[in-house]
Structures are given as structure tokens and as C-alpha cells.
């Protein structure tokens, strides 16, 4: 069993908006070196253990594809400091930055910038934020040592993960509300869509 609130609270979340562009930022510390995290984030074999089955050529000019999900192009790649890719479309950019910290730990920063999300204000962060929360959780579980039979695809639909997703949606709801970029009506509509996707059957 995972401590859901511990993992939710381990992440710092921010959201901002400039015109039609929404930026989502996340930060979390990991008890692993930047080199260890880099391998976990870019080696398809390791990605399949904690995130999702992935194929591709992880170098500048290469591309990647998540099984039955998003893909993109590698725009920047500087191991073990970070990378920048398109994610799911030409107007969606994902950047990961790894910063060495004390005692062989690493501070990970994730930024996802999207232009033209079909939701007013920064409410679109509720469409992608919970998914990245799940990814950062998976990485934390991987660093701590996953059991041999762990499958991230089936784990994504487990009751435990759905409870985690519910708390993630609520966390992002607060972050977007505090940003002041979205009306309450539009925000609640985005939250309902997000909850239906990430935690079906749960009411706000």
C-alpha cells in the first residue's frame, strides 16, 4: 500500500497562463543521483517498468512513442541534466530538469507548456496534471524498489491508483483556483472532466 497523501504532498505544483498558453510546473525530490534518474527516464526498458511501454531513439533529432498514447520529437537532450520534447503535438512541450542535491539525491523539475488547450484559462492543467502526478509517483516507487510483478499499465487502473488520482485532481483544482486564471464555473467544469477521466465514479 502506498501512502497517498505523502506522495501528493511530496510534489510542488504551479500553473500559469500567458494568453492561450498554459504552463504547468512540478517539483519533487528523489533519493537517487541525476545519473540514476536519467537512466530511468530515458531507457525504454526502465520506462516500461514504472511509466509506460515506450519506443524511440532518445537523442536530439530522434523521436519517441508511448504505447497507445502520446509521442513526440526530442528537441534538447543533455544527460544527465535534462531534456525537452514535444508531447502529443507541435504546440505541447515537455521539459525535465535534474538538479543534484545533498546525500546523492536529486531535485526533479517538470514543465509542460501547451498552447490552445480547449478549456478557458489554466483549467486545462486539470487535463494533464494528474497524469504527471501518476508519473512522478511511479518514478518514486521505482526508485524505492518495485516488486518484480509490478505492471504500470494494470496498476494505472487499480483501486489504489484511482484513489491517488482523486487526490491529485483535488490538488490541481486548488492550484488552478489559487492562480486566479480561470472562472469558478469553468474551473469546476474542467475538474469534472478530469475526475471522470482519472477517477471515474468519484464526485467532486
Q: Where are the predicted features?
A:
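Short beta-edge strand/loop motif at the mouth of beta-sheet-based domains
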Residues: 18-21, 25-26, 32-36, 44-82
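Short, low-complexity Ser/Thr-rich regulatory SLiMs
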Residues: 76, 98-102
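Short, structured patches in soluble enzyme cores that scaffold and shape functional sites
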Residues: 100, 110-114
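A generic structural signal for alpha-helix starts
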Residues: 32-35, 42-45, 126-130, 134
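Amphipathic hydrophobic-ligand
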Residues: 90-91
Amino acid at each position: 500500500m502506498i501512502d497517498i497523501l505523502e506522495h501528493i504532498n511530496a510534489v510542488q505544483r504551479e500553473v500559469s497562463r500567458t494568453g492561450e498558453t498554459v504552463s504547468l510546473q512540478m517539483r519533487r525530490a528523489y533519493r537517487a543521483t541525476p545519473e540514476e534518474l536519467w537512466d530511468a527516464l530515458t531507457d525504454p526498458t526502465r520506462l516500461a517498468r514504472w511509466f509506460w511501454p515506450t519506443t524511440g531513439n532518445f537523442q536530439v533529432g530522434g523521436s519517441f512513442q508511448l504505447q497507445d498514447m502520446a509521442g513526440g520529437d526530442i528537441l534538447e537532450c543533455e544527460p544527465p541534466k535534462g531534456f525537452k520534447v514535444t508531447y502529443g503535438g507541435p504546440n505541447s512541450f515537455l521539459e525535465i530538469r535534474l538538479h543534484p542535491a545533498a546525500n546523492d539525491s536529486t531535485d526533479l523539475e517538470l514543465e509542460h507548456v501547451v498552447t490552445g488547450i480547449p478549456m478557458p484559462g489554466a483549467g486545462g492543467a486539470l487535463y494533464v496534471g494528474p497524469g504527471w502526478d501518476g508519473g512522478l509517483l511511479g518514478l518514486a516507487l521505482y526508485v524505492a524498489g518495485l516488486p518484480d510483478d509490478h505492471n504500470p499499465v494494470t496498476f494505472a487502473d487499480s483501486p489504489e491508483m484511482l484513489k491517488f488520482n482523486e487526490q491529485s485532481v483535488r490538488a490541481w483544482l486548488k492550484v488552478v483556483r489559487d492562480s486566479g486564471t480561470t472562472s469558478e464555473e469553468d474551473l469546476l467544469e474542467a475538474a469534472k472532466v478530469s475526475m471522470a477521466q482519472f477517477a471515474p465514479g468519484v464526485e467532486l
